[in-house]
């Protein structure tokens, strides 16, 4: 097995020029796997249970059913209106939206919508939560960009 040790310096030099976009303004993804249930700031913790007919295990691929449709997740940030919009088709019962100060201004009223349903507090003021920050840093291991708030559709 070749180690490609002579390429490591080239790879590291290439990586210096790349920056991770922690918070893209929008994203659109599709999934057929129950464990692919989190994308950037959107998580669907019970995706496999909510939509068993839309999920397929890789060992069963290609799916035997022609009715199998991927779950589509789209989200956009509107910084001028302090709004986060999430659209999931087909709809799932439980969606979590994680927020950071890079996404919304916690000092102003904000709106968070999942499938056109408001999930933010009635007064629009979203309060950061230290427990969410610590748990997120622990589970994701990203101590530089932890999520500050989680809003749930349940």
Language model region names:
Residues 1-154:
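Alpha/beta-hydrolase-fold serine-hydrolase catalytic core, especially in secreted/extracellular enzymes
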């Amino acid at each position: 097995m070749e180690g490609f040790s002579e390429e490591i310096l080239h790879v590291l030099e290439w990586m210096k020029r790349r920056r991770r976009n922690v918070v893209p303004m929008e994203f659109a993804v599709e999934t057929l796997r129950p464990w692919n249930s989190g994308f950037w700031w959107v998580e669907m913790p019970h995706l496999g249970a909510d939509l068993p007919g839309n999920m397929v295990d890789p060992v069963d691929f290609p799916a035997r059913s022609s009715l199998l449709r991927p779950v589509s997740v789209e989200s956009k940030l509107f910084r001028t209106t302090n709004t986060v919009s999430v659209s999931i088709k087909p709809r799932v019962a439980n969606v979590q939206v994680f927020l950071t100060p890079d996404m919304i201004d916690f000092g102003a009223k904000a709106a968070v919508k999942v499938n056109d349903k408001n999930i933010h507090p009635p007064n629009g003021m979203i309060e950061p939560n230290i427990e969410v920050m610590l748990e997120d840093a622990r589970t994701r291991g990203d101590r530089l960009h932890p999520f500050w708030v989680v809003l749930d559709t349940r």
